[in-house]
């Protein structure tokens, strides 16, 4: 059960996340907070529940972390998919996992729109290839960008959009449309949707499926093709399926830890 804190009492947070009065804190590590959360007023106005997480031995934490890191490092973007069908239930589980992502003001400003219809996939491919043809062949994509993509061997041909059993388009909701026709502002929309996209990719990888983050530019045609409302804008497109047997991917090297992680131990 969530606790209601007594005004004027200085509370600490125990190892299990529970708020404790001073007399209860002798045998736990303590963090001292001048302003407990939730405040008594907030807890009285809105529901709160206890967040209980088992604290594992550090050796087990490290073992889990390394196992997850090894599995995550095996993930690769795939451009050749098997046409074998993928049950809708697997996509639903991935979307539910993605929707556990933190979001600005808990607005969850995203919609995952999926299709396995051959006609819809063909229309998406045709429109995407037209945009990419302009990008690659008419130099809407500048030389520096094309040079960066050269090791990946990408071009305007997007056959995977028809071969993959599913196409999932993630839309960001720029604002909320309420049932009465009024609108409400959403916050940190791109940041929130990006986090959800990462969890979606990770969930697919965890269950043995492959995907590719595909962003034909511009992507406005997707809102029209998929019949989405004005408040939604396409964020990224995912072909989803099993990787084709024998598929090859670029032999790339990811950045080392010291290239992506910095610890700061004093003010600058």
Q: What is each of the regions a protein language model found here?
A:
Residues 46-54, 69-83:
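Generic N-terminal amphipathic, Lys/Arg-enriched alpha-helix
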Residues 5-19, 31-60, 236-268:
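C-terminal helix-cap and adjacent tail motif
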Residues 97, 151-156, 222-224, 247:
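Glycine-rich, charged/polar anion/phosphate-binding loops
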Residues 12-16, 41, 113-193:
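Glycine/small-residue-rich phosphate/adenosyl-binding loop
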Residues 99-106:
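Glycine-rich phosphate/pyrophosphate-binding beta-alpha loops
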Residues 133-141, 227-250:
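A glycine-rich helix N-cap at a beta->alpha junction
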Residues 93-98, 174-225:
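Small-aliphatic-rich amphipathic alpha-helix that forms the alpha element of a beta-alpha
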